[in-house]
């Protein structure tokens, strides 16, 4: 493996981590939005706050990681994507800011009306953010981002591959969140809520799975390079995604919630990995390969050292934080 590919692999590990951890975070907004009235949805919204409260900002570590690696290791392609896809990126950024602010402000609202307003903003921004990030991925994967950065500001992300990418991003986030929330509700003894979420998570999973595989048809015409990769070297990952998704549905149906979470993570990670492997060796599809887009060798070597240090310094505290959130320890009065 060349150093350029090694750095690209490290970059894509961050994308997978953000898709899984940030995705479960974003997806909670879908269930918040569809929870119902203030009284009817109170129990579910409390569960959402309890589940994502300790980690909702920690998940953005992976987005920062991806951006830093990308602009440092592959600066020209980064500049090209930021220029051509500036509109969906700005909308995604707006969603992230609104989501974070409204999540915090809702807790300190003085009136029910304010709480409802911030709740709607939180839920809506939880949907638009992954949608626009998905359109960015679709624009890159369909070869609509020229290296010169002169791509069309609208058609680069308003196209079949991008729109399906956005819908798939929202669906996978909701599916992950539903699976995680079901397990949290069951662990905390909320059996009725767990059963309600179980049915909704099953529905979201079926719809999302159907959309993922339906997208293969327009992608075949709209993004032929990606389609060839998905039908070739990435085919095992496509099959794994299907099997893991099906296993998640079966496990949810049988109320095996802890194992279902692992299967859901495998399913989503396989979908995202399939995209990366499918467009390899291109960084910007049909424009520039990973090797040709890479920066100076010294920079790449320093980045790999930085990644190794980050694994040692950042991953253990994050793992401990996530372990705490999967128990009731952090809610005890002495914590």
Task: Label every PLM stretch briefly.
Residues 1-58, 64-67:
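N-terminal signal-anchor module of multipass membrane proteins
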Residues 1-11, 71-86, 141-162:
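Helix-coil boundary and interhelical linker segments in multi-pass alpha-helical membrane proteins
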Residues 105-260, 273-274:
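Long, contiguous internal "core" modules enriched in hydrophobic/ aromatic residues
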Residues 43-64, 89, 115-129, 191-204, ...:
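Juxtamembrane helix-loop boundaries in multi-pass membrane proteins
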Residues 284-303:
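Short, membrane-exposed interhelical loops at transmembrane-helix boundaries
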Residues 7-19, 82-95, 123-127, 157-174, ...:
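Alpha-helical transmembrane segments
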Residues 55-126, 225-232:
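Membrane-interface helix-loop-helix modules in multi-pass inner-membrane proteins
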Residues 251-258, 317-332:
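Membrane-interface capping segments at transmembrane-helix boundaries
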């Amino acid at each position: 493996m060349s150093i350029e590919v090694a750095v690209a692999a490290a970059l894509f590990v961050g994308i997978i981590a953000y898709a899984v951890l940030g995705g479960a975070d974003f997806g909670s907004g879908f269930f918040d939005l569809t929870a119902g009235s203030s009284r009817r949805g109170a129990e579910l919204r409390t569960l959402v706050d309890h589940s994502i409260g300790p980690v909702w900002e920690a998940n953005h570590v992976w987005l920062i990681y991806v951006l830093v690696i990308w602009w440092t290791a592959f600066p020209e392609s980064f500049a090209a994507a930021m220029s051509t896809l500036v509109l969906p990126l700005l909308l995604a950024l707006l969603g992230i800011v609104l989501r974070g602010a409204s999540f915090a402000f809702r807790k300190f609202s003085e009136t029910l009306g304010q709480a409802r307003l911030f709740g709607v903003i939180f839920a809506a921004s939880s949907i638009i953010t992954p949608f626009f990030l998905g359109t960015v991925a679709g624009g890159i994967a369909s070869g609509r981002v020229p290296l010169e950065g002169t791509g069309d500001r609208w058609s680069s992300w308003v196209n079949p591959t991008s729109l399906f990418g956005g819908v798939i991003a929202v669906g996978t986030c909701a599916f992950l969140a539903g699976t995680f929330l079901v397990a949290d509700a069951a662990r905390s003894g909320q059996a009725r809520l767990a059963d309600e979420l179980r049915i909704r998570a099953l529905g979201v999973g079926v719809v999302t799975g159907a959309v993922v595989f339906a997208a293969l048809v327009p992608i075949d015409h709209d993004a032929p390079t990606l389609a060839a990769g998905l039908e070739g070297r990435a085919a095992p990952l496509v099959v794994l995604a299907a099997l893991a998704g099906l296993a998640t549905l079966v496990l949810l149906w049988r109320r095996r919630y802890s194992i279902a979470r692992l299967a859901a993570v495998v399913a989503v990670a396989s979908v995202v990995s399939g995209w990366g492997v499918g467009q390899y060796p291109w960084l910007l599809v049909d424009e520039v390969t990973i090797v040709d887009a890479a920066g100076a060798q010294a920079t790449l070597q320093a980045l790999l050292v930085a990644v190794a240090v980050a694994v040692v310094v950042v991953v253990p505290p994050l793992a401990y934080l996530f372990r705490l959130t999967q128990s009731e320890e952090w809610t005890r009065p002495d914590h």
